[in-house]
């Protein structure tokens, strides 16, 4: 059925649109953006007082399927995405088996086609088993549907292997995404190395562990010409190096997470495992540098790094529990509160970070409301008041530091390929 999204403020950075208008979707695609559109057979969504944007893209999500379905599935993770205003998500390869072959990539594509509430795009591994030694079947994975390659939380430590991976990535025109961490510097660490790690008696992860890897990889990106992307950037020096590379013509991009611009290590509740993630929450100075990078345009995208873990694993001693938090349902609200409400960035810039920014890296053919584009739309309110109850999350996991937080601003409706998948009014996910 056609759908008309009526009377919202339409902001589409891809087409430089910012005006009150209607959005008309027919047969799963954008048919028009203009005032006073109507169709007697169309479903109507009243967006008066709301922002209507291209469907948001999260380029860094862990769906855990296959292999870890007790933590998340493609179905449950995609439902959490819909409830967070995301219409497209890219899933990392740290599954069991690792997504290092066309067989696993095809499995994810087929499961997503039949069960996902939103568009799901798989990311293939750089190396077999993400072991950092032998390159995975990159060409075969791309043919099966992979949109990028990454070993995710297992950085490619061997520079020779990384060089070869970049050469292959360039030949297949795929971005290569690196979790930047020198494991020799960070080994055994549980939180940011600084005054708080000393105070709490926890081993630290120095900012230098990220900086060293970014520096090495920028040299390799210059050597190979690969499209290189830094995942969840978290340090001042790393942001500066990415800016240096971009200013010298390197095809380098980076993303950051809502928790890295919304929290610092000073905000951590001592020994609360819901504040344990990697990269860790850094000092206030590093957090401020991340915000500066978002303002300046050095950072291309906001990505959640949604990393579900069941309570049986996460609620252990801080030193023993796994890294990571869920984030799909709180990302937009955090960005509105921490970035837009204080006047640090505009609504248009926020939407760029969730649409044209990740689209420029992943090249999914999404992230715009121009006629003919897929009918993916995110409707949100900058002011709606709501309280996040992690126990009501669509995710299978509950590991969030934002439980019981009252937000001002958040998603109102998620439309995927012309179908209403979630709305705040009904809270029903289809």
Swiss-Prot record:
Which pathway does UniProt place it in? Pyrimidine metabolism; UMP biosynthesis via de novo pathway; (S)-dihydroorotate from bicarbonate: step 3/3
Q: Name one Pfam family in it.
A: Amidohydro_1
Where on this chain does substrate bind? 62-64, 94, 309, 323-324
- Entry keyword annotation includes Metal-binding: yes
So where does Zn(2+) 2 get bound?
Answer: 152, 179, 232
Family the UniProt entry places it in: Belongs to the metallo-dependent hydrolases superfamily. DHOase family. Class I DHOase subfamily.
Q: What is this protein called?
A: Dihydroorotase
| Organism in which the protein naturally occurs | Solibacter usitatus (strain Ellin6076)
- Lineage, please? Bacteria, Pseudomonadati, Acidobacteriota, Terriglobia, Bryobacterales
